[in-house]
């Protein structure tokens, strides 16, 4: 299977990129986050997280307080095909970390759904539960399509192949028992162009609302949102763990009233062999109060990255370094004592 992320940098590359012994600075070390297509939510969010937690030698805000990641670590965001591809790349060690929806990660750990062919992805561990994503169904502004049921016999893009949008949109069509005439799997940018040109009738977009691409299309009168609601949504939520009823609020896009839909949570995942102390430092930096202004000023849904979502992490394994941090801040219960371990004399 083709990997969407460039291989060659394993989890926490410990070889120094530059060394400054005269200045007594730590060596630079690289750490990647596999994200998704540029027009989606994952790439800008990956770039923001990278800025928040990176700790290049000599950066003033990192030296003044413990609000950055491990000294010398430079975090970067990499584009990819999306969630499924990110999970596979993290599991096999061809990328350090990645973003993926919680339901996709749960499928990977269990070896079901999109991972039935590749089998259980046993090396995946979770660093953080980051933010919710809303499924947004776009059709032409002049289209008669008013519901998911109206997609029957139409031309529909599900998003990038092997992306979270592809996985969840497929589940939506199944739950509503809808069979489009043609299914397309293209990036959001291409899907938007195809909709403008009348070459498809609708496309699914999974990400934070508002999104720049959708705001532009809605604002120009080229597209409108269609609700995902009713009995079909109820069947979908009952079938797919990790999905919940949600809505896009009034005013999220110009002239748009509230739109019923579904949402899921995005996780930051890493391989199980990542050093616990390094993962601890990265997670601590992400939630450090000193970094809160950077998240508040970031693109939607960066504002949703906050402590308090760790309950949803329990369906998939936490990385030990992350678990240690959550225990220390009271988000997880303390580690119970081992009754078979003899106390030191």
Predicted regions and their residues:
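Secondary-structure end/capping motifs
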Residues: 59-60, 175-183, 192, 236-237, ...
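Bacterial N-terminal signal peptides
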Residues: 8-16
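Bacterial N-terminal signal peptides that target proteins for export
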Residues: 1-9
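An extracytoplasmic/periplasmic, membrane-proximal ligand-sensing/linker region
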Residues: 190, 197-198, 207-220, 225, ...
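Pocket-lining segment of extracytoplasmic ligand-binding domains
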Residues: 102-104, 112-114, 143, 179-274
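N-terminal (or domain-start) structured segment
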Residues: 24-101
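Bilobed "Venus flytrap"/periplasmic-binding protein-like clamshell domains
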Residues: 30-65, 129, 133-197, 292, ...
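Immediate post-signal peptide segment of exported/extracytoplasmic ligand-binding proteins
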Residues: 21-34, 68, 145-155, 320, ...
């Amino acid at each position: 299977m083709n990997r969407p992320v460039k291989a060659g940098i394993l989890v926490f590359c410990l070889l120094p990129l530059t060394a400054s012994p005269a200045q007594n600075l730590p060596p630079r070390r690289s750490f990647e986050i596999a994200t998704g297509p540029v027009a989606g939510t994952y790439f800008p969010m990956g770039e923001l997280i990278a800025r928040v937690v990176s700790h290049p030698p000599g950066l003033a805000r990192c030296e003044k307080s413990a609000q950055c990641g491990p000294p010398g670590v430079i975090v970067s965001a990499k584009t990819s095909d999306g969630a499924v591809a990110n999970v596979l790349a993290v599991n096999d060690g061809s990328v350090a970390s990645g973003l993926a929806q919680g339901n996709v990660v749960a499928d990977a750990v269990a070896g079901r759904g999109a991972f039935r062919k590749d089998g259980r992805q046993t090396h995946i561990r979770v660093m953080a539960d980051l933010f919710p994503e809303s499924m947004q169904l776009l059709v032409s502004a002049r289209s008669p399509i008013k519901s998911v049921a109206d997609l029957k016999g139409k031309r529909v893009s599900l998003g990038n192949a092997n992306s979270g949008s592809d996985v969840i949109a497929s589940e939506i069509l199944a739950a509503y028992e809808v069979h489009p005439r043609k299914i397309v799997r293209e990036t959001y940018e291409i899907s938007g162009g195809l909709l403008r040109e009348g070459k498809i009738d609708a496309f699914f977009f999974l990400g934070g609302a508002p999104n720049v691409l959708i705001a532009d299309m809605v604002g120009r009168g080229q597209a409108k949102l269609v609700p995902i609601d009713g009995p079909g949504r109820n069947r979908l939520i009952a079938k797919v763990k990790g999905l919940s009823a949600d809505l896009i609020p009034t005013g999220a896009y110009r002239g748009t009233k509230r739109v019923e839909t579904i949402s899921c949570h995005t996780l930051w995942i890493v391989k199980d062999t990542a050093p616990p102390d390094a993962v601890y430092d990265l997670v601590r930096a992400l939630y450090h109060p000193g970094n809160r202004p950077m998240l508040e000023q970031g693109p939607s849904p960066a504002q949703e990255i906050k402590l308090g979502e760790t309950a949803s992490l329990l369906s998939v394994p936490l990385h030990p370094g992350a678990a240690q941090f959550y225990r220390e801040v009271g988000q997880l219960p303390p580690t119970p004592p081992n009754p078979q371990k003899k106390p030191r004399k």
